[in-house]
Amino acid sequence: MTRPVTLSEPHFSQHTLNKYASLMAQGNGYLGLRASHEEDYTRQTRGMYLAGLYHRAGKGEINELVNLPDVVGMEIAINGEVFSLSREAWQRELDFASGELRRSVVWRTSNGTGYTIASRRFVSADQLPLIALEITITPLDADASVLISTGIDATQTNHGRQHLDETQVRVFGQHLMQGIYTTQDGRSDVAISCCCQVSGDVQQCYTAKERRLLQHTSAQLHAGETVTLQKLVWIDWRDDRQAALDEWGSASLRQLEMCAQQSYDQLLAASTENWRQWWQKRRITVNGGDAHDQQALDYALYHLRIMTPAHDERSSIAAKGLTGEGYKGHVFWDTEVFLLPFHLFSDPTVARSLLRYRWHNLPGAQEKARRNGWQGALFPWESARSGEEETPEFAAINIRTGLRQKVASAQAEHHLVADIAWAVIQYWQTTGDESFIAHEGMALLLETAKFWISRAVRVNDRLEIHDVIGPDEYTEHVNNNAYTSYMARYNVQLALNIARQFGCSDDAFIHRAEMFLKELWMSEIQPDGVLPQDDSFMAKPAINLAKYKAAAGKQTILLDYSRAEVNEMQILKQADVVMLNYMLPEQFSAASCLANLR
């Protein structure tokens, strides 16, 4: 296997700080770390997140992935001047093969003296709670007084929302410090332990104030002499409270002390070997063509790994992974449809774990269906750890009325129920895992099928599915959306097949499923091969979208039209019928797929 490539940041710019903090993020599925710089910048958003750790900040808020105290930040002062970048010679790259982020800078102070500042860090693939960082400083042409301040900075928030109370901070000996933090609802604890070791003759002291626990290291260097600081961080969290806080914190600290017996390079070697084995089974190699094709594939696979909580079936993959706070860290249908297939064909145990996440949250889905007057299971459009609905109530401002617009997805974008069932069937057909399909899979298929059977409404002599939103979220509250209806039928048909195959004794369900399949009305493919998106889409006017396709930014059409106006035009936000062709290719001819795509 050839070595996976790297991703380089071409130059330093304060305008792209957060872009590259996401693109070059690191992680292992247990925790995610944004690629923020050690030094502070006003526009920079730091972030570190644990899969499954959500909290609601207060009344009117929703559960979101908690931004943890920062451990990357370092204030570096050389001869009293604080290090900050502008246009220095620099190199920064993320190595996909090892997950290591490296940066090298030649920095000149205001009086012209030069210094090489190099940093590297990785999130361990071998020991999930471990982060290792190293920074070296070398004066090039003059002696220097260097001061490095780093530790645990608990002033971090989720865009101003604070989720953690500082429960306990403490220093142990000359190198160890620990902060224990508790979510404000008292349900979860986070222990962050740090070990900072510095080469050479240095002086050190600690401060703990204003939610910052810091170690300050000062060194006197001659030109050409290097000071190296290695920082190890161990992060544990819990929501069970089985052990006393001190006992639990001490156990976490002991794990860090064991890691500290090894050097940065030794720890990196173990993590890199874990990555090597992972890549060996999964890397896709492109022969010929543009070199960027290989980089794009390596990038995609790298992020697929670092966003997937393979260690914990009570967590799933957030829409933005663990790279930031977009979508509050919530789980959508994207997981089952776009991400699970990769794991299904590379490591089916991970796909099984992702499906068991939905199975664990089945009671919440059943309760949501019941509250809305339906049977079976209606999974939340956005979910976190509990399985409850987490979709915000409001979104953007209506440009016509000036009022906030309600998010309709949680009320009507129900196709995710069938999407989850589709993923169950994909897993079953690929693995033949009878123990899963007979238990968790059967429960998911039957409860999702029961939802669709109760969700349909009778119109004369047939059943229809009304008031839904398909994958295209610019077309809301329509009847007989093709994607939804076809997927619902597939859901019920496969649930019926599995029920019969495994001897389901629920005769009432079998009868109702048979009647649903017989009576459900499906939109038909037109003579030109096009499948209408819903009952009304083809009758809506079309407008010239060239202006909006060319515009920078996202959803710029909403600067000219309200959502209600867009809803009455032939405008798609996401693939809908084309997505259906992808999901159920055996039900459509190649000619029809091409007609819909055009």
Language-model segments: which ranges?
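Solvent-exposed loop and edge beta-strand segments that line ligand/cofactor-binding
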Residues: 323-333, 404-417, 473-485, 560-574, ...
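Helix-terminus loop motifs that line ligand-binding clefts
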Residues: 308-323, 349-422, 428, 435-439, ...
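Acidic/histidine-rich catalytic neighborhood
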Residues: 401, 447, 451-508, 512-515
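Alpha-helical scaffold segments in carbohydrate-active enzymes
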Residues: 299-306, 357-364, 443-455, 490, ...
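Inter-helical turn/loop segments and adjacent helix faces that build the functional surface
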Residues: 142, 146, 239-246, 251, ...
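Alpha-helical support elements that line or immediately flank enzyme active sites
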Residues: 134, 297-305, 335-349, 361, ...
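Active-site core of glycosidic bond-cleaving carbohydrate-active enzymes
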Residues: 331-361, 493, 497-500, 504, ...
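Acidic/polar, glycine-enriched structural segments that form the non-catalytic walls/loops
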Residues: 1-26, 31-327
